[in-house]
Regions:
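Extracytoplasmic/periplasmic, Sec-exported soluble proteins
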Residues: 123, 136, 140, 152-155, ...
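Acidic, histidine-bearing metal-coordination/catalytic regions of metal-dependent phosphoesterases
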Residues: 2-135, 146-155, 271, 361, ...
């Protein structure tokens, strides 16, 4: 009798588990691909093209009107859609175009819409706005956005990066509307958003549905064949975007092999690499713990940092940990924090100003910057009450980064929600520093 009851109980539990699994899959699918209304936004920007995407409540043929001074050209879809995509190609590099989008079932905000194609001008002044873990639609997020707008003082952003966790808590279509599209409407009119996936984004499948990234090297760099990791160039900066959440993080995995090929071919003066999980942190996550984030921080540190430093990457940006942490110009620290030795791992000990040879030299020093602080609504308290020894600069208040690249100098500013610049550092490159 007891055996029979146990069998029946087990069968019921299996049935309920299967039912839950099916229901859960249904929720994930619904949240990931739910049809929502969405204003036009820019994607997959290159020197010669850009993609425009938007979503309407009814099926219709969308059109984009565009031109350098007037809206003299038109590109339309061939079949009615709800999810719209139009690629504008045959454009001129480093050129600003006006554009507007026509839709019948959705009121489009076409005020002040323009974009600028990517440039290969090594002398251009480039301003890069970096947001990390910005997907909470809250007062902090809005204050961080407003503080950067005031700090820019009317200057335009050339490149826009997000470090993952772009829509809390689960990266659904509706959460992306709230945490991204409703939060940054003006920037979305003018700039393609280059983003990496975070752990919260990966709870649903909307990320790779919303975003479209270059896979064939069309924006610069070596073709990756995958939107999970890719590269693009703007001015004299080579950007590399990696998926530390869902992709194989092994040293012999496809992402690592592609990274080596891409960096070996890179001829740009500056290289910035972006991935979500920081190799060094004592913020809201602990990079010493293999149990934290299922070892992703450890794996990125052990398997990817040797590649980045071998090819003389200048700056590595990460989020995930809700704070601001920064290293000095450093190298070769691939172990846990208790193995840190300043005499071995710090290349230059100045707190703010760094010098590098204009030629790429292996292991000449990299700055690691955690900036997952764009919507966390922090109280200024370090949850671990200790700094990571590799990261002597650390603050636990919300803000975002402005990176300004002018020829052979890169300056990074951490602008917090009240407008104060809490940290500023620079790297200068010259033949005079080649010793």
């Amino acid at each position: 009798m007891i055996k029979k009851i146990l069998k029946i109980t087990l069968a019921v539990l299996v049935f309920l588990g299967a039912l839950y699994g099916i229901g859960r899959l249904g929720v994930v699918l619904y949240d990931s691909y739910k049809q929502v209304e969405r204003q036009p936004y820019l994607q997959k920007q290159t020197q010669e093209s850009v993609v425009l995407k938007w979503q309407t409540p009814e099926k219709e043929k969308g059109c984009v009107r565009y031109g350098k001074e007037t809206l003299s050209q038109t590109r339309c879809e061939e079949t009615p859609q709800k999810n719209h995509r139009i690629e504008l190609d045959g454009l001129q590099k480093a050129t600003t175009y006006l554009y507007s989008v026509d839709a019948k079932s959705l009121k489009i905000d076409n005020d002040d819409r323009y974009f600028t194609t990517l440039s290969d001008d090594a002398n251009m002044t480039q301003r890069i706005w970096v947001l990390g873990d910005s997907g909470n639609y809250n007062e902090s997020q809005q204050e961080v956005r407003t503080a950067m707008k005031k700090h820019l003082g009317g200057k335009k952003i050339d490149t826009w990066l997000m470090l993952g966790d772009n829509a809390y808590r689960s990266g659904t279509q509706e959460q992306y509307n709230k945490g991204l599209f409703n939060a940054y409407p003006d920037t979305l009119k003018h700039n393609a958003l280059w983003a990496v996936i975070g752990n919260h984004d990966a709870r649903r499948w909307a990320f790779y549905d919303i975003f479209e990234f270059p896979v064939n090297g069309e924006a610069g760099g070596v073709a990756s064949g995958s939107e999970k990791y890719y590269a693009f160039d703007n001015g004299n900066v080579h950007f590399v975007m990696l998926d530390s959440q869902t992709e194989n993080r092994g040293a012999e995995g496809d992402m690592a092999k592609w990274l080596q090929r891409d960096l070996a071919a890179n001829k740009k003066l500056w290289t910035i690499v972006v991935f979500h999980h920081p190799p060094y942190s004592k913020g809201s996550h602990d990079s010493d713990s293999y149990y934290d984030s299922r070892g992703r921080m450890v794996q990125m540190r052990e398997n990817f940092l040797p590649i980045l430093e071998k090819y003389d990457v200048d700056l590595v940006l990460s989020g995930h940990s809700h704070g601001y942490e920064r290293s000095l110009l450093s190298h070769r620290q691939y172990g846990y924090s208790d193995t840190f030795d300043a005499t071995k791992h710090v290349v230059q000990s100045d707190l703010h100003d760094y010098k590098k040879c204009e030629e790429k030299r292996p292991y000449s020093g990299t700055i690691y910057n955690v900036a997952g602080a764009s919507s966390a609504d922090q109280n200024g308290i370090n949850p671990f009450n200790v700094k990571h020894p590799m990261m002597p600069v650390s603050y636990f208040t919300d803000g975002s980064l402005l990176i300004t690249v002018v020829k052979n100098k890169m300056e990074v500013e951490f602008v917090i929600r009240d407008g104060e610049v809490l940290d500023r550092y620079s790297i200068e490159k010259s033949a005079a520093f080649c010793r």
